[in-house]
Amino acid sequence: EFAVQLLAEGGAAASEAAIVGPSLVQSDLFGYSSHGVMRIPFYLQMLKDGDIVSQADLETIADSEAGLATDAHWGFGRVQCGRLLDELANRCKMYGSAIGTIRNCSHIGRLGEYCEIAANEYGLVTIAMVNTHGAARRVAPPGGIQSRLGTNPLAMGVPNGDEALILDFSTSATAEGKVRVKQIAGEQVPSGWLLDSDGEPTNDPNTLYDEPPGTILPMGGEQAYKGFGLSLMIDI
């Protein structure tokens, strides 16, 4: 209730706060603090700056029955993606499968949550992925020192009785939010997560937010081309 209250008093519509607040709390309870209530101050600032638009419409920009492309007009990501998911689930009933895209969307929260909803509420198998089209470049290519891609997560879900099977991971060594959690806590990050602006390995989370900024390594360690390749294809 406190999360909902903070969002509502910060400019979110009551109906939106009632969706976004519990989603953030659930992420914390599931162990994903990077996508939990620590996001509330950032959301409130984005509302203030106009980077999140309360009560934005979800516009259909292309429709081919089993395919749907939408524009979120910078509404709350959790709200707009939830609307898209509900519509795609209805189309799956009609056509057997469906695919959808959403653009101009604010932070969507934990990607795996949508796969959980699709599996547990609709009985659907899902594959979901996110890119930022250069808006939040954090990840350097193997051998590079400048960021070129976002952390571009990938998630899959399969119905399994009361508890769906969910796979949810960033294509980088870590999600940006996990670095932020360490920074807020005043802790070091594990080795293998970050490079500083000179391309040297570092355990200091502050380097990712310095000027010039450091970068997050791609997923895969010595086989980092695999994580970067996945990220590149998601971006495309």
Task: Name what the model sees in each region.
Residues 12-36, 52-63:
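N-terminal glycine-rich anion-binding loops that anchor highly charged ligand groups
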Residues 35-89:
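Active-site cofactor/substrate anionic-group-binding motifs, chiefly glycine-
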Residues 212-236:
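Internal helical hairpin/lid segments
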Residues 1-10:
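Generic N-terminal amphipathic, Lys/Arg-enriched alpha-helix
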Residues 135-209:
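Phosphate/diphosphate-binding glycine-rich loops and adjacent basic-rich segments that engage nucleotide
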Residues 14-15, 79-82, 224-231:
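Short, conserved micro-motifs enriched in small and acidic residues
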Residues 68-161:
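A generic, well-ordered mixed alpha/beta core segment in the N-terminal half of proteins
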